[in-house]
A protein has these predicted regions:
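Outer membrane beta-barrel transmembrane domains
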Residues: 180-183, 187-363
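A cross-kingdom feature marking solvent-exposed beta-strand/loop segments within repeated
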Residues: 79-88
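Short glycine/proline- and aromatic-enriched beta-strand/turn motifs that initiate or cap beta-hairpins
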Residues: 20-59, 63-78, 113, 134, ...
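Cleavable N-terminal export/targeting peptides
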Residues: 1-25, 362-363
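Short loop/turn motifs that connect adjacent beta-strands in outer-membrane beta-barrel proteins
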Residues: 20-27, 57-67, 103-112, 149, ...
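Short, charged, low-hydrophobicity "junction" segments
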Residues: 37-47, 148-151, 193-194, 303-307
């Protein structure tokens, strides 16, 4: 999902010097995931995605770190209705992101520079278009929300300072993207898409609480006008609020995370408003120590409101198990989702299943 929910929290950093690091402290992370939803009438679709993201963190020294990430993804939309619609699939490598982080003054100031290398599938055929479109839905929150875009570059700075027992952080960034051809039209033409610039500002606070922490953050993203084939439109600005809390309680670890994404109304090329939307999410997890690891059942609730449509809602019951062994951190997880999905023709019952295996090797 493109929320970048962690962005607000990334502004806060502990105001303590980093331990000495080198390339020998490189760590590798992978997280194969499968997510599927079955949406009943009037939508009548099963939407599935399998992804294998890989992320490598390479610390050069205590102040300079590089990270590289990419993924393989395969998405599928299968119509379940009585019609003759064809199944839509799209798969392949996604874009590759390379980022450098340079810190100053005991990590009080962090300068970030990143590039998006278009190694993914940036152009969807007519047969692939439905699958490419469906995985971009913010409410359904697929792990990979697009298969590829053009070249892009991002630069940013974040500053964190202790204020008494609190840590306060703020930052900003700018992203510029090159044009690309996102799809093949039914006429065979390939419209050129030029994304507008993205400007982002972030602010966050965190504070120790018992054995854990309490953190809040706010991210504002402003988007310039997009141009596709000479038609100008705007997707609307986004506001992301986030709060998180974790602490020990009676031998268990309690985790509460909440976020809210508000997108202001955009505008299509005719001058018509697209309408605002809001997605709210809360997750409660309780971790129990046992069997050489931590077992964590969780409950997650999400609500999506749009103009001129009923609210969409879903709930997910999940379970994960975390264990560290021989330099590896392994976390398998699974969850079942149920709810309703608002569509033009009425509400559709929704159910789904997800499974993931997160693996980290290295320090």
């Amino acid at each position: 999902m493109r929320f970048l929910i962690a962005a607000a929290a990334s502004c806060t950093a502990l105001a303590t010097p980093l331990a000495a690091q080198s390339v020998f402290d490189t760590n590798v992370r992978a997280a194969p995931q499968f997510l599927t939803y079955q949406i009943k009438a009037p939508v009548n679709e099963t939407i599935s995605e399998f992804t294998t993201p890989i992320f490598v963190v390479i610390p050069i020294n205590s102040t300079l770190t590089f990270d590289v990430g990419t993924a393989f993804a395969s998405a599928r939309v299968k119509p379940n209705g009585p019609g003759t619609e064809q199944t839509s699939t799209i798969s392949g490598l996604t874009d590759t992101q390379i980022r450098a982080n340079l810190s100053f003054g005991s990590d009080f100031v962090v300068v970030t520079a990143g590039v998006n290398i278009p190694t993914g599938k940036e152009t969807a055929t007519q047969e692939e278009l439905l699958a490419a479109f469906r995985i971009g839905n913010d409410f359904l929150a697929f792990p990979i929300s697009n298969m590829g875009t053009g070249f892009g570059a991002t630069g940013g700075i974040a500053i964190a300072r202790p204020i008494g027992s609190w840590n306060f952080g703020f930052g900003g960034s700018l992203r510029q993207s090159a044009s690309y051809e996102p799809f093949v039209a039914n006429t065979g033409t390939r419209p050129r898409f030029q994304p507008g610039n993205e400007y982002r500002a972030r602010v966050g606070l965190d504070h120790p609480f018992g054995t854990g922490r309490f953190a809040v953050g706010l991210t504002y993203s402003k988007f310039g006008n997009d141009d596709i084939g000479g038609s100008i439109y705007n997707t609307g600005d986004r506001y992301i609020a986030q709060a998180g809390f974790n602490n020990s309680l009676g031998g268990a670890n309690v985790l509460v995370n909440a976020w809210n994404l508000y997108r202001s109304s955009g505008m299509i090329f005719t001058g018509e408003r697209t309408g605002a939307e809001n997605i709210a999410n809360i997750l409660l997890g309780i971790g129990f120590h046992g069997m050489s690891g931590v077992i964590e059942p969780s409950v997650e609730l999400r609500n999506w409101t749009q103009e001129q449509l009923p609210a969409s809602m879903l709930g997910t019951i999940g379970l994960r198990y975390s264990v560290d062994a021989a330099g590896f951190a392994i976390t398998p997880s699974a969850g079942y989702t149920f709810g309703r999905f608002a569509a033009v023709g009425g509400n559709a019952d929704l159910s789904g299943f997800r499974a993931a295996l997160a693996i980290r090797f290295g320090s």
